[in-house]
């Protein structure tokens, strides 16, 4: 199985990404499945050089995940009479390497155990009672250190730390009911981190809201995170569809830490988000680092809150070639005020003005087993002051264009 995407921005940011996975079934003769997934993405700034040298500005992410799935619940043990619907147990080990150009290199690795239940054809439950991740900041640059010396929240989010978490996810999908022309898909997920460890400390006499408690000599994260997403596919006619999507998320850190881990925070933009803007190029809120080094500001374009809305009209052109026009909107925000990122906190009175907006068009070559997609995003509105009056405030038309080549539909 292979997924591929390539993104190009008019500001010379170019980046491919790919996911390659291999699966071996019936590993032990009892229906077990062993899987390996390798993913990677790379982005470089084609029109800029570092400090006058020939080195290109580049960032990359690499990830390796191995899974072993048993087609039953291993613990506790249920009889077939107690559980007469599909269920499975999955053990997972993973490692993710994140390199941010000129700033830092972060390694996150860990493992988890989860249960999957499907009591009906349309409902799916996923329970992860145990997940432990360790974030290791491997390398920082002088430029990064100079930023974190004044931006304590960013420094805290990237510190070496454990993330002991548990998760529950519910998914509803009525697409298996083939008699319906219109399809609904929605998912809700909640993650809690650090509560059990904090409870153990509380039993030992430590105050619940006291910070800097540790696990094996390193701090551990404590937060609650929730996301919800809904998609609706409405059939207009022969191979014509109006597809809508809404997504919202929030993460709140408390107790042992007031800043959530960097890789748990929200970001926006890219081939499956607001296609006129590249990943981590907007937000939080109206925040904008107005300096010569703004192209590197993606390191702190993360937030505690996220809202995103997409509307796409899909239509046939010729044979397996289809077209699409779309409208994308959204942003991320901070829950707490951060003086290092002015304008980043959510203010309900300016919510609509804070939403970035983009439109565009695309082509899809649908071969049933694979969809090859090319989208052109066109920026209409940026949430921060660009110096241009009016709702359409893109300084130059070409600055608000994004080009995306990908495998699969965006949603």
Label each PLM-derived region with a short phrase:
Residues 13, 29-31, 237-239, 318-320, ...:
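A cross-taxa feature marking solvent-exposed loop/turn segments within ectodomains of secreted
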Residues 2-14, 19, 23, 126-315, ...:
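C-terminal outer-membrane beta-barrel translocator/porin domains of Gram-negative envelope proteins
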Residues 328-330, 335, 360, 364, ...:
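Flexible, small/polar- and glycine-enriched "cap/hinge" segments at structural transition points
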Residues 307-315, 329, 356-367, 406-407:
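Conserved C-terminal beta-signal and adjacent last beta-strands/turns
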Residues 8, 24-26, 71, 339-367, ...:
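Strand-loop-strand
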Residues 110, 129, 270, 356-362:
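Glycine-centered small-residue hotspots that permit tight backbone geometry or close packing
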């Amino acid at each position: 199985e292979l997924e591929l995407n390539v993104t190009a921005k008019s500001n010379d940011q170019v980046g491919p990404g790919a996911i390659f996975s291999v699966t071996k079934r019936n590993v032990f003769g009892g229906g077990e499945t062993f899987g390996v997934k390798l993913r990677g993405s790379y982005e470089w700034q084609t029109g800029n050089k570092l400090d006058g040298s020939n080195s290109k500005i580049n960032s990359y992410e690499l990830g390796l995940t191995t899974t072993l799935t048993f087609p039953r619940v291993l613990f506790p043990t249920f009889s077939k009479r107690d559980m007469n619907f599909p269920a499975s147990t999955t053990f997972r080990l993973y490692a993710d390497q994140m390199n941010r150009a000129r700033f830092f290199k972060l390694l996150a690795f860990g493992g988890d155990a989860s249960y999957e239940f499907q009591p009906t054809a349309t409902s799916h439950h996923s329970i992860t009672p145990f997940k432990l991740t360790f974030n290791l900041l491997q390398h920082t640059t002088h430029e990064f250190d100079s930023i974190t010396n004044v931006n304590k929240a960013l420094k805290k989010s990237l510190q070496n730390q454990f993330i002991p978490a548990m998760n529950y996810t519910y998914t509803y999908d009525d697409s298996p009911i083939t008699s319906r022309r219109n399809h609904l898909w929605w998912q809700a997920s909640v993650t809690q981190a650090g509560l059990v460890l904090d409870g153990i400390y509380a039993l030992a006499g430590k105050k619940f809201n006291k910070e800097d408690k540790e696990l094996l000599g390193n701090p551990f994260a404590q937060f609650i995170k929730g996301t919800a997403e809904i998609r609706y596919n409405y059939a207009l006619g022969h191979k014509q569809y109006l597809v809508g999507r809404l997504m919202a998320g929030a993460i709140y850190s408390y107790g042992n830490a007031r800043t959530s881990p960097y890789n748990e925070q929200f970001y926006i933009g890219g081939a499956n988000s607001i296609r006129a803007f590249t990943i981590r190029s907007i937000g939080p809120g109206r925040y904008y680092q107005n300096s010569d080094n703004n192209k590197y500001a993606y390191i702190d374009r993360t937030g505690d809150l996220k809202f995103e809305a997409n509307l796409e009209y899909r239509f046939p052109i010729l044979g397996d070639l289809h077209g699409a026009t779309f409208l994308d909107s959204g942003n991320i925000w901070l829950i707490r005020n951060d003086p290092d990122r002015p304008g980043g906190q959510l203010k309900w009175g300016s919510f609509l003005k804070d939403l970035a907006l983009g439109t565009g068009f695309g082509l899809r070559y649908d071969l049933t087993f694979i969809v090859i997609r090319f989208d052109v995003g066109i920026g209409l509105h940026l949430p921060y002051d660009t110096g241009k009056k009016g709702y359409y405030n893109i300084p130059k038309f070409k600055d608000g264009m994004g080009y995306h080549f990908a495998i699969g539909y965006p949603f």
